[in-house]
């Protein structure tokens, strides 16, 4: 996937952090939940534990002389996932608010803080 050119004004912000619990909204894995293993803000993608898993054939090498197959998670586009509300367990949008001088993420549906 080509990256935006150096001069583009692409928004490199994500609503997700490593460790967040998210749910997949669309596609083959719709409805599955998992923790964010890796956030890729430049590509607007996230890697979710146990979702979008592929089997990769690995050639034998010095570190792995046997070779074989390994399971690996691929990145999903950030628009296909949503944060899980800690109170209801359902997908929610996120709003940022300042609480006690700190900027925190708040679930829109329930008003609970996520951070």
From Swiss-Prot:
GO biological process terms on file: translation
Task: Fetch the PANTHER family from UniProt.
Answer: MITOCHONDRIAL RIBOSOMAL PROTEIN L24 (PTHR12903)
Matching InterPro entries: KOW (IPR005824), Rib_uL2_dom2 (IPR014722), Ribosomal_uL24 (IPR003256), Ribosomal_uL24_CS (IPR005825), Ribosomal_uL24_KOW (IPR041988), Translation_prot_SH3-like_sf (IPR008991)
Superkingdom of the source species: Bacteria
The answer to whether UniProt assigns keyword Ribosomal protein to this entry is yes
Any one GO molecular-function label of the UniProt entry? structural constituent of ribosome
Coiled-coil annotation: which residues?
none
Protein source organism: Deinococcus radiodurans (strain ATCC 13939 / DSM 20539 / JCM 16871 / CCUG 27074 / LMG 4051 / NBRC 15346 / NCIMB 9279 / VKM B-1422 / R1)
What's this protein's name? Large ribosomal subunit protein uL24
Its family remark reads: Belongs to the universal ribosomal protein uL24 family.
Keyword Coiled coil present in the record's keywords: the answer is no
Gene designation: rplX
Entry-linked Pfam families: KOW, ribosomal_L24
GO CC term, one of those recorded: cytosolic large ribosomal subunit
**Which sequence ranges are marked TM in the entry?**
none
Keywords attached to this entry: Ribonucleoprotein, Ribosomal protein, RNA-binding, rRNA-binding
Functionally, this protein is described as follows: One of two assembly initiator proteins, it binds directly to the 5'-end of the 23S rRNA, where it nucleates assembly of the 50S subunit.
HAMAP family, per this entry?
Answer: Ribosomal_uL24_B
């Amino acid at each position: 996937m080509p990256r935006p050119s150096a001069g583009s004004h692409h928004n490199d912000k994500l609503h997700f952090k490593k460790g967040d619990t998210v749910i997949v909204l669309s596609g083959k894995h719709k409805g599955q939940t998992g923790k964010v293993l890796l956030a890729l803000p430049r590509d607007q993608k996230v890697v979710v534990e146990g979702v979008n898993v592929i089997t990769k054939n690995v050639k034998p090498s010095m570190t792995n002389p046997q070779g074989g197959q390994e399971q690996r998670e691929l990145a999903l586009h950030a628009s296909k996932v949503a944060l899980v509300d800690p109170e209801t367990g359902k997908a929610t949008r996120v709003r940022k608010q300042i609480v006690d001088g700190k900027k925190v993420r708040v679930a829109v549906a329930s008003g609970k803080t996520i951070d």
